[in-house]
Amino acid sequence: MTLAETFNTENHGNPLITLNYEPALESLGNDYYDEVTAAEFPQLTLRWRNDAILPRLGLNPQIVTDEDFITAFGLFQGRKPLLALRYHGYQFGEYNPNLGDGRGFLYGQVRGTDGELYDFGTKGSGRTPYSRGGDGMLTLKGGVREVLAAEALHQLGVRTSRCLTMIETGLGLWRGDEPSPTRSSVMVRMNKSHIRFGTFERLHYFQRSDLIKKLLDHVIEHYYRHLAHESDKYALFYAELVKRVAELVAQWMAAGFCHAVLNTDNMSITGESFDYGPYAFIPTYNPYFTAAYFDYYGRYCYIQQPSICQWNLEMLQVPLRAVIDKADMEAGLAKFSEYCHAEYNSLMLKKLGFEELKTPEAEELLSLTLKFLQESQVGYHQFFYEMARTFSIKWRDEPGLVLSGSDIVPPSGTDANFDNWCVLYHKILNNFDYEQVKIIAQNLTHYNPKTSLLRPTIEEAWEPIVQEDNWQPFYDLVKSIQSRG
């Protein structure tokens, strides 16, 4: 009996297969993709299903079975064509024309209950014409890490993809940077679009300005619909993309998130965060923290992320000049820093409890906060969580009480900065009445959840899987993230 025969293959009963899929990208023609076949796997075990996002697809989680997930996204029955998307990209600043979906494909596109178009994109589903000698597979740990990153960022308010499901596939993989053989998985990502900056860069490489315009019209039609009937829709599209990307990177920075691989092929044309590889959340405020061991010169370190995203947007201008006036794009890009700075300041103030502050106070508080965090190397997440945990309305009346019951212990030599910060925070609180201070307390709790996704936390969830096939710590961690515990 084959693996497929052990599962119910009556596709008409599988709500994941009978969704109303739209051939939006497929209708563009095969200049943008290759039709591929999914790999066959020796053993399929459902390890994760994201019931939280099924209602957005119009599905009741109670009627979608584990078997439905395996049949749809492990056996890949009932969906054709499967599309490996073509793209190029700047990787660590160097143009690479040998890219494309090398271990995944576009499974399908479906309209959500919100009227938006969503992609189901696989990772680890087998070789494609763009695998470049790779096996087309995803390690189980890679799948686990992407699930955790997406859920954590979503709860922190970052515009991000989500993981719909993760299935263990029974293959042993050999990887130079992991103990091998290591276990394997297929992960299905749900996001607005898998069209990347590098999708346009590839078309420019082949001098296909006609295909650039066709793709740009498609992007505006489906993802910037409010611009579709504007006379200057192309320039407005680029200006809005700049704003989306600037706000996205500000969201990363406030969350203490380091993406690690900000190549142009990892930049979404919708301004979403996706494709999580060797990412990390900063343990302490070190501006030059670098997440990827192979980023030898720190190109994608934490503090460089805004400038790198701005550079990526500048590189995108090259293919888009086939449609959009260069001066219009430069005018749009000129606002990047303004957008990023405004979003970052707003988010950081919220982490400190404030919806808004007068500019001088806001800048002084943010500057002093980052100065203390950098000099003291107190945990980045710990600092804000301890504010939320120990906040008292009495902080308004007495500066000596600010953070007095917390676990924040400033190292020797940083006491003065800490004291200055406490005095300033008290001074600002004193401008608010008691009812407003209660709202500040609520903001602190909302924007600073207890659970953080530092690397040791991920390892604590992963090691029981490796040692005992015990998934409970992983499930507990996901539950804690989703509940903002």
UniProtKB/Swiss-Prot annotation:
Presence of the UniProt keyword Transferase in the record: yes
Enzyme class: transferase
Catalytic-site annotation from UniProt: D265 (proton acceptor)
Function: Nucleotidyltransferase involved in the post-translational modification of proteins. It can catalyze the addition of adenosine monophosphate (AMP) or uridine monophosphate (UMP) to a protein, resulting in modifications known as AMPylation and UMPylation.
Family stated for the protein in its record: Belongs to the SELO family.
Family annotation (HAMAP family): YdiU_SelO
Name this polypeptide is given: Protein nucleotidyltransferase YdiU
